[in-house]
């Protein structure tokens, strides 16, 4: 047996920034086509992450903006709801304004607080 097979690939926590994690009504179509193509088979189901949340999903920090014109905020909202439905510890920040791809958001004092809040979230988890 390979040693790598004895180590879990499950992350201890997730940090998702304006994530592309939902297919269907709120998808970013270009991302879906690039990742899995046109077919809506097993890959479609397995990569529609809000539907893959289980009791084993790691604690998750999410942030997004309400007016992201590339990835709808519903990607984060649906994932956060699924986490709550499973009793998974999560923290969600939905900022009213900000373009997609803000990164550390130095251009927006309000949104830039996400990195500090994320640090606090991870600290509370023991990291």
Language-model features: locations:
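Primarily recognizes the serine-hydrolase "nucleophile elbow" in alpha/beta-hydrolase
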Residues: 1-31, 40, 44-45, 49
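C-terminal catalytic histidine-bearing segment of alpha/beta-hydrolase fold enzymes
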Residues: 63, 73-127
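Acidic catalytic loop of the alpha/beta-hydrolase fold
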Residues: 22-23, 67-71
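Loop/turn elements at helix/coil->beta-strand transitions in domains of secreted/extracellular proteins
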Residues: 10-13, 57-59, 86-91
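Short beta-strand/loop motif that positions the catalytic acidic residue
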Residues: 56, 61-64, 68
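Conserved serine/cysteine hydrolase catalytic core
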Residues: 49-57
